[in-house]
C-alpha cells in the first residue's frame, strides 16, 4: 500500500483515498501481533512448498518483466522460473541456459526435472525430454504433469502404444482436463482406436465448454462405438454429455 502511494506521483491511489492512515493501521497490526503469546509469535512455518507453487505460477502466468525481476536470485528455483519465463518469450537459448543452471543446482529436484523436461519437449529435443521426465516421475510418483508430457513425448517418438497407460493414469487424477483428453484422443487415433478417440475428443469439447464441438464429436463417437467393444465407454460419455447438455440448455 505504501509502495502504491510512493509510485503514484501527483495523483492519490484510489485505495488510499478511501483507506487513509496506512501507517497507523500497520502500527496497530504490529501492536496486536506483539500481544500474542510467545509460542505463537515464535512459531516457525515451513513455506517451501508455497514457494515452489509460487515459482510455477509466476513462471507460467506472471507478467514476464516482473517475473524475471522476481527470479533474479541464483538458487535453483529462481533459475527454473527464469527458464520458464524466457521460454514463454521465445528466448530459447537463454531459457536452455537457465534450465541447465537449475539442473546443476538441484539435479534431484523433481519439479526442476519436470519443468526442464517439459521445456525440452516443447523445443523438440525428445531425447533430453525423455531422460528428464523419467527422472521426475521416478522421484515424484504423484507428478501427473510429468506423466502427461512423458506420454506426449512417447507419441512424438512413434511409441503411442506405450503412451496409453500414462494417459489413463493422468485422467484418473484429473478426469476433467480437456487438454489431456485431446492429446489422448490423438494418441488413440494414431493406433487405430477411432471410437475411443472420438469419445475423448467429445470429453475434451465438453470440459472446454464448447457445445458445438461436443455435439459433433458425441455423434461421431456414437456412430463409431454403437456395436463395438467400446460401447461401455460410450455409455459413460453419454451420461456426462446429457448432464452437461442440461446445463447448457438451462442458460
Residues covered by each model-derived region:
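Canonical positions in the second alpha-helix
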Residues: 101-102, 135-136, 169-170, 204, ...
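Extracytoplasmic and endomembrane cell-envelope/extracellular-matrix remodeling and assembly machinery
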Residues: 1-138, 142, 163-166, 210, ...
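Structural marker of alpha-solenoid helical repeat scaffolds
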Residues: 105, 139, 173, 190, ...
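TPR/TPR-like (Sel1-like) alpha-helical repeat modules
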Residues: 172, 195-226
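Canonical tetratricopeptide repeat
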Residues: 81, 115-116, 149-150, 183-184, ...
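Primarily a tetratricopeptide repeat
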Residues: 97, 131, 165, 182, ...
